[in-house]
């Protein structure tokens, strides 16, 4: 787990109430995916301005905004015991993928959702007469996050879109009713929202972003790292091009895009038969699915990824132990201390250090033209930091680092 991921998860967990007392143990053992999803939901609620209650061992959350209290229970689809993971199988054909989306996944979603439905959380004293919501994410096999959202939506509403371009060149979307999903001898009815007792569930929240990759991106965005790294995100997103039949492929360098919200990629499916309905604007920064005049419609605003992978191109550099007078500095801390730091046009900041009393800052830079290492030492004045020492053209990172630390100590001691 790299710095942005680890530091962002630690930051979120620092205010996370462990209501059942099992979070850390399960996070470190068999419940890593489920607990990561739960931590992601907490980060989303907290950073989106909801009041959060975790005074009860179940459900996982009660949130409140604008006077409305909503109870939320999280669940995940986990690997089947003894099942071979998809990354050990051959690539799926188009027909095999369609079968998985149309039948296998809906049955897995149904199993998890009905398991939670049968617990009847809405009958708990603190959940009575308020909306109850289930949040779900699929971790059952390698690659499941890439194709699970459409399967869930089809299963919940019991219909799927058939898209084609007509002779006039316009996109035509036709609704096809789904009656059942079948794998082997197991058959379940489609249309979860239309099954008995499901009126007690006001909505289903789905995300394919409740993973460590989300924490990596948010940590990188907040500058929670002490060595330079390039983080790239690529995947498929909603395509706003008129008549688009397929999602749009994207590649983002996160150094150039830093406005991701915790809700980006979140999907909210509202139950048309809910006993206690939720308005379409209650869950912020999320795509909304709901029924109007018998038709399922979607509100998607802004960048909406369906699936993605996050790649760290340059990883952390190995470092030895620092003297007690010096510590590493987050990039975000540096930006707060120094509003404008002039640097050579072909140099990249790689590491940042600061004295414990915050009077001395040290920077290590890589000259991209000749691949040599340089350092800059800055000292705090009356109103700002000023460069007091610069050395250039080191061949090894370890050498420039040792020289910088020695120079910083000479100003400290």
Where are these regions (language model features)?
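Acidic, metal-dependent phosphodiester-chemistry machinery of nucleic-acid enzymes
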Residues: 1-15, 20-28, 75-413
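Conserved catalytic cores of phosphodiester-cleaving nucleases, focusing on short active-site segments
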Residues: 61-63, 70-78
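A short acidic/basic microdomain associated with nuclease active sites
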Residues: 42-64
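Beta-sheet entry/capping signal
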Residues: 51, 60, 69-70, 131-133
């Amino acid at each position: 787990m790299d710095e942005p991921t680890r530091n962002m998860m630690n930051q979120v967990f620092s205010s996370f109430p462990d209501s059942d007392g099992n979070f850390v143990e399960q996070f470190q053992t068999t419940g890593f995916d489920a607990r990561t999803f739960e931590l992601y939901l907490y980060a989303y609620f907290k950073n989106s301005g909801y009041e959060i209650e975790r005074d009860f061992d179940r459900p996982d959350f009660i949130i409140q905004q604008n006077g409305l209290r909503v109870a939320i229970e999280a669940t995940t689809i986990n690997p089947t015991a003894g099942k071979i993971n998809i990354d050990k199988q051959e690539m799926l054909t188009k027909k095999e993928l369609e079968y998985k989306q149309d039948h296998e996944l809906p049955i897995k979603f149904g199993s998890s959702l009905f398991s939670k439905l049968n617990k009847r959380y809405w009958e708990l004293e603190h959940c009575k007469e308020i909306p109850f919501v289930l949040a779900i994410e699929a971790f059952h096999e390698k690659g499941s996050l890439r194709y699970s959202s459409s399967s869930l939506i089809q299963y919940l509403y019991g219909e799927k879109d058939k898209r084609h371009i007509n002779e006039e060149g316009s996109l035509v979307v036709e609704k096809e009713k789904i009656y059942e999903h079948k794998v082997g001898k197991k058959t379940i009815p489609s249309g979860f929202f239309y099954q008995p007792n499901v009126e007690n569930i006001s909505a289903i929240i789905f995300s394919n972003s409740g993973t460590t990759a989300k924490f990596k991106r948010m940590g990188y965005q907040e500058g929670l790292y002490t060595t330079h790294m390039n983080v790239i995100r690529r995947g498929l997103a909603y395509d706003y091009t008129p008549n688009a039949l397929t999602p749009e492929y994207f590649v983002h360098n996160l150094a150039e895009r830093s406005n991701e919200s915790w809700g980006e990629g979140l999907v909210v499916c509202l139950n048309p038969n809910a006993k206690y309905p939720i308005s379409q604007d209650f869950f912020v920064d999320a795509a909304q699915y709901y029924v109007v005049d018998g038709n399922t419609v979607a509100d998607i605003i802004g960048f909406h990824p369906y699936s993605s992978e996050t790649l760290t191109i340059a990883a952390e550099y190995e470092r030895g132990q620092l003297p007690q007078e010096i510590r590493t500095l987050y990039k975000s801390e540096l930006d707060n201390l120094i509003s404008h730091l002039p640097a050579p046009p072909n140099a990249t900041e790689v590491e940042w250090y600061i004295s414990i009393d915050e009077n001395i800052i040290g920077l290590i830079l890589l000259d991209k033209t000749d691949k040599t290492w340089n350092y800059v030492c800055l000292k705090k004045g009356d109103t700002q930091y000023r460069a007091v020492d610069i050395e250039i053209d080191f061949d090894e990172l370890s050498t420039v680092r040792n020289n910088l630390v020695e120079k910083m100590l000479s100003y400290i001691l």
